Amino acid sequence: RRVGALPGSAQYEGNYARCEDTLVRFPLGVLWFDDTLSHFKRSPQPEFVDGIMVSRPKDWQAERVKDNWSIDYPLRRPVLSDIYTGRVLLPTEQSSLRNRLPDIGRDEPQQSYYHAPHQKTMLNPPTPVVGTRINPITGLKEPRVFPKTYGCDGGVDYGLLYTLRSGTAAFYDKSLESGTVFISGPRSGCSNSIIPSGGLLNVPYFYEGCTCSYPLPIGLSMVAMPETHEQWTSWGDDPVKPNSILRIGINFGAPGDRKTRDGTLWLDYPSVGGPSPQIRVETSPTTPTFRYRHSLWMNKGQSQPWIGASTVEGLQELKLHDLNPGRYSVRLHFAETDDAGKGERSQTIHLQGKPVLSGFDIHSAANGSMTGLVREFETEIDDGTLKLNFKATVGRSLISGIELIRKP
């Protein structure tokens, strides 16, 4: 039976301090969710000690100081809960820890909002700018700016993760330059309540007193998952200058962007999952058939399952502009996600006007359906435009993604 926090994890003592928990990294999956322990939306930040969350919910049914709305509700007594299960501890448990906690807030006036020192406004904080990063598409240094929608919490930089309320709870993994990940459904607090500690990303229930109609009034904890786990981000709508692209992935039919730890930023095309870099793509026909399936349907293959699971069908020609002229490695990602069997789909593909795949049957090459397949080629791109042509001889053309990496 586990006692205490996960080995190698970090504790969080509050006050918006850095908490560089290396166990908390993109992608993240849900470990548990529950609605037993709830907090008023403007309660102070919890602390995390030895795998236990120490929180002080506000007593939002108590009377406030009349004619002075800057003084908020008093605090209840500390509540202790296990971060790995969500279980609220009994008053008889962890007596040593309870005895060390200061009894604050019951008789002292509390401020209405709790924010990190860098946040200067209570409402509608500006879009965060958190240091600099290397743009994975261009290789250039730029300000680390990422999408934020509405919410009183402007975010906190915990060192490796930046977390914020962006409509729902959200986070950005700085170790990866992930883009913004929206934890859709639950509402996080007006105080920042999305905290990496104990090897988890902790998102306690900070919804009480809010009139917004969020669909999931719950708390949850998230744990790091393998790279095969499906999770999507929104990178932001950066403009793309001519001849600037050095590396890029195009994920046809995907519901969002995704950055890999080997360095490729995969963009959903068409862009549907939030703002993405403004790449210039031309297709013929202009509206081929895009399809998405969840990656859990995929078998183990050569491609990441979240790339292979989505496709474009019926594509005849594709042009991607604004590449930096030079020699490129071009990886074509495929998976037979329809019910076409062996011999029921065949296509010939030209890259920069030269045939690279002839009579290509995805099902036969992958030894089955729902299995990712990659074919890699090198080509010279002199005019800054990638050109791919597809001709189906049986059925319709099908491809999942394209990855381009400029050679040194």
Walk through the language-model features, giving the residues of each:
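Secretory-pathway ectodomains
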Residues: 1-241
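Compositionally biased, intrinsically disordered or flexible polar/acidic segments
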Residues: 231-408
